[in-house]
């Protein structure tokens, strides 16, 4: 049976009062944060002007107790409104104005150093925009995603300017001199990510180098996107470090990739090289059935974590004797690494823990992949390397000690 009830269009009044998405999503916490942010910024700028004039607002002379404090002669003349967008959202602030006397008897308008002329966004807001773009979101989607937070104040030109700033910082970081870096140790490792090349999803390698300063502080030295971990690829990375002034390191920690070890021998022959003990442990397990994994791990750890060089050597020989009889592939795999698996014993025992593995880079790789796991493919090889750097430079990924 056909219904005779006809749907009528909403009247003009009803249409105007119809609720819109997010209209009733008022958050008193967010509102309070913006109010406090506005108050803090205005107080910061007023304090800056007070310091320049050596007197607070509404006082003609210098503040009591500051009579001898040098200050610039001048006078305030009201304020002007400024719009500012931060990670807290958009706010309106009142920026104080002042005229300052100059040496030639004229006056000039005071300019705040805290809030630069024409500044419309905080650095945190720019970092948020850049992060969205670096993560593979195009300009249109960045604007759409951030329109609610920034009250629609993110235009195409804004995204483009922020992107150019990130690209400029990235280029400067890649070209910076390393001549004054007191690097004594290098940790080198690569990881595989998926990027779009010629409209196809392709696997590439990100080759990462961390430097360890004499005081133990770690610093990211290089990250390059390459087609793989070949000798030529790693040689490109090492040659670039040398070109930028990096001094010959005293110790190297690697994952065991043949291409890397060959490249190292070509540029830094004679420098002690430590094969990552964690990578070698994985290699051993890959050569044995699962039923032997627990026993292999116990014997391996007993050897690697022995307290003295003598104990390590004794347990190494015992490991090889036992596993040559029980499962020869295990003994052969350990012998393949040779003395490079135990190069850490050349260092003081207090440094053994940090010198045995490439864990410092492995943790960065894990955190980076966790950040991009929702994206099956990154936009390009260059963007992949830049995103790794940007996440670390912005503090979104932290390097452990």
Residue ranges and their predicted role:
Residues 1-24, 47, 51, 55, ...:
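Acidic/histidine-rich catalytic cores and adjacent linkers
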Residues 2, 72, 76-79, 90, ...:
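RNase H-like nuclease fold core
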Residues 2-6, 12-108, 112-115:
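Short, conserved DNA-binding cores of transcription-related domains
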Residues 34-38, 119, 135, 152-156, ...:
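Conserved phosphate/pyrophosphate-binding and hydrolysis machinery centered on Walker-type P-loop NTPases
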Residues 124-136:
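Short, amphipathic alpha-helical "recognition" segments used to contact nucleic acids or chromatin
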Residues 140-151:
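DNA-recognition alpha helix
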Residues 251-258, 263-299:
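Conserved beta-strand -> loop -> alpha-helix junction used to position metal-binding or nucleic-acid-contacting
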